[in-house]
Structures are given as C-alpha cells and as structure tokens.
C-alpha cells in the first residue's frame, strides 16, 4: 500500500540518505539471496509507479548493481494509465537525470476502470489486472528475465490478513513467483523492509512522488483498515510485525488444518518420535513473557 509522504518540520539537519539506505540495502540483499531473486545476466524490469516504494526499490537495485558480485541490467518502466492530471514530465525527467535506461508506456486504462467498475466498488482489482497485462507484455518485448515490484513488509502482511479475514484463506504475497501468463518471473526485493524505513528514506531523498488518483480517492478500503491495525500493533508492541513475517517462513503443516498439506488420515502412532501434541509451546523467553503479560495470564 502506497502511503502518502507527510512533510516533517524539524530544526535538526536533514537525515543523510546514504545512512538511511544502508539497512534497506542489507535487507534487500538478504531477500535476494534467500529467494534467489536475481542471478547472473538477468535483465530486471523495475515497475516504477511514481510512489515512494518503487523509487526506493530502483535506488536499491542501482546501488546493488555497482556492488554485487554478479552482473545484471536494470530497466525502469512506468505505465501512464491516462489518469487526469498525471504529470507526464516528472518521471522521464527524473529517470533521465538518474541516467538509468527507462521506458514510458501509455495506455488509457483509467477510462476502462472507471467505466467498468460499479458505483461503490473498489477499482484496485481491475486496475491491477489491466496494468499487469501491459507490463507482462512489455517485459517479453524487452527481454526482461525478472519483473521487480515495490511491495514491502507491510504489503505482504496486509495481504495475509486480508485473505484470512475476507477470503478464509491462509495466503500472503510471495517474494518470488511465476506471473499469471506463465512467461515472467516476478520478484519483490523489498519483502523484508519496513514501510517506515522506506518513508524516512523517501523523505530524505525528496522523491517527486506522484499520488494515484484511483487508489487515493477510495474511502474505507479494507486494506487501509487492516494496515491501520498492523500499524497499531507495531506501535504498541515493537517487533510484532517482524515476528509475523518470520512465521511465514517457519510453517508447520502438521499443526494446521489443511489436509492437502498434511496427511492426517494416514496418521499413526510412532513411538520413536514421541507425542508432543500436548507439550507446552516453546517460545523465546522475552516474547513468551510479553505475550503472557498482554493476555493477562500472569494471575
């Protein structure tokens, strides 16, 4: 979810963008290594929306391009969707000054979305579907081997809870996947990065952020509600969002209810393994005590 940047007024010196970028680069490098997102000779198409996340992603990949032990290309691509008032000169000017290869595509999907979306319904699903199709096609045309999107930690967790709350499915947003058309590999290098870190970096870099007239004009989006919930959790219990994210990497199918993931029907007693079904859960002491305090179970 692209959050608007709120200018801050301070008497202190402006933060050094390089210092703010360093931890983001480390986390992105970790994610790339963990999921083998970028390999030798890749041509990475970075989808640049004009929001803080994709600007940050482009900066990080350009930085890694100079430092990484492998060679890969970066191509920035923006899709002008015909939104009224869209500043057509901002991104070409910015990308030219940056010296990065870039393509600006023009397709009036805005009119299609406004025409096809019933009153009171959100435009996100149709808009993203149309946008994906155009970007996938362009990736094939330029020979891109990877398509990089700017989704960060909060985007992944919002999707997890959206699917749980409204779709009754345990499903998040993968860091790497095969695209809908089966011909592209999509990667999310910012998967480990907190949105707050991106906001601080984007403010320090003073990116020319372009708001989305479709997304930003829709009140009461369920994703916004879920995002506020996560923000509240992290504010009251720092580290909780990282723990939730880590839990997605440490799944125990035998302790869930999905019969497709675990063969409960064929389960039999295996004395050598023992029965841990009724054993106490094992948590790190700090998290365990904090959880007990929160649940008022220390009585």
Swiss-Prot record:
Its cofactor is Mg(2+); [4Fe-4S] cluster. The thiolation reaction likely consists of two steps: a first activation step by ATP to form an adenylated intermediate of the target base of tRNA, and a second nucleophilic substitution step of the sulfur (S) atom supplied by the hydrosulfide attached to the Fe-S cluster. Keywords: 4Fe-4S, ATP-binding, Cytoplasm, Iron, Iron-sulfur, Magnesium, Metal-binding, Nucleotide-binding, RNA-binding, Transferase, tRNA processing, tRNA-binding. It is found in: Cytoplasm. Homodimer. Belongs to the TtcA family. The keyword DNA damage does not apply. Gene3D superfamilies: HUPs. Its EC number is 2.8.1.-. It comes from Deinococcus radiodurans (strain ATCC 13939 / DSM 20539 / JCM 16871 / CCUG 27074 / LMG 4051 / NBRC 15346 / NCIMB 9279 / VKM B-1422 / R1). This is tRNA-cytidine(32) 2-sulfurtransferase. Signal peptide: none annotated. GO terms for molecular function: 4 iron, 4 sulfur cluster binding; ATP binding; magnesium ion binding; sulfurtransferase activity; tRNA binding.
